[in-house]
Amino acid sequence: MTSSASSPQDLEKGVNTLENIETLPQQGSIAGVSQGFPNIQEIYSDRDFITLGSSTYRRRDLLNALDRGDGEEGNCAKYTPHQFANPVPLGLASFSLSCLVLSLINANVRGVTDGKWALSLFMFFGGAIELFAGLLCFVIGDTYAMTVFSSFGGFWICYGYGLTDTDNLVSGYTDPTMLNNVIGFFLAGWTVFTFLMLMCTLKSTWGLFLLLTFLDLTFLLLCIGTFIDNNNLKMAGGYFGILSSCCGWYSLYCSVVSPSNSYLAFRAHTMPNAP
């Protein structure tokens, strides 16, 4: 850095001079060394002043000029952070719709027992879209929602793939009891997972808590009904699944409705001791 020690410039009635500022310790330096580059000047700063090459400025005035001080219009463009949309309603929509259709089939509503036509719904809307919502929750830093939506998105894909009987997943079993046991193991695993996620909603909203409560009962009844091949238990699981879906619809509506877009605005009721 080049400076003229023979002609100090008074900064404020002789209190501080350019010569004094240039001899400050370089702890506040924010620029590199100018060795070998004669056209590059160094930058030093202390509490009140900033030195740019051979010129010294008051810190307050320089920040005001850069539009970082008292709000005066400066020459530097302001940085506006990008706002991401909330992906949770999308995850709730894909889960609630798929759960409702499957539960109606499990409950044998209107005598329906074969749900192969809903395969596309399970794999694409319940599976792919919910998995996509979970990945978007990863982007916004919501670990819980990412885990729940991504996991259940995988569940719907697995369930739909099993219905296709690709690679003889079902028809390859010659013993119906063994097939029921394998499916029962699958449902038992999801019963445990859902219970763990349920324990993480004790300080959340009532809608989410009841959704996972009814869903865990759904998996439990379907699991037991599959193990013992009892259709009444499977139907009971279907009815609990309908309740779980209704809780999902309510939570979905509460998360997207507002006085600006609807005259009928509900609010999500929080659990006791919720933060």
UniProtKB/Swiss-Prot annotation:
Alphabetically ordered keywords of this record: Ammonia transport, Cell membrane, Ion transport, Membrane, Phosphoprotein, Transmembrane, Transmembrane helix, Transport
Topological type in the membrane: Multi-pass membrane protein
A Pfam cross-reference name: Gpr1_Fun34_YaaH
Topology feature Cytoplasmic, residues: 106-120, 203-207, 258-275
Keyword Isomerase assigned: no
GO cellular component: cell periphery; mitochondrion; plasma membrane
Location in the cell: Cell membrane
GO molecular-function term, one example from the UniProt record: acetate transmembrane transporter activity
Main location: membrane
Domain of life: Eukaryota
GO biological process, one term: nitrogen utilization
Record PTM Phosphoserine, positions in chain: S4
Induction: Expression is under the control of the ADR1, CAT8, and GCN4 transcription factors. Also induced by external ammonia and in rho(0) cells.
Membrane-spanning segments: 85-105, 121-141, 182-202, 208-228, 237-257
Biological role: Transporter protein required for ammonia export. Induced in rho(0) cells, probably to eliminate the excess ammonia that arises because of a potential defect in ammonia assimilation in those cells.
NCBIfam families to which the protein is assigned, alphabetical: AceTr_1
Protein name: Ammonia transport outward protein 3
The species this protein was found in: Saccharomyces cerevisiae (strain ATCC 204508 / S288c)
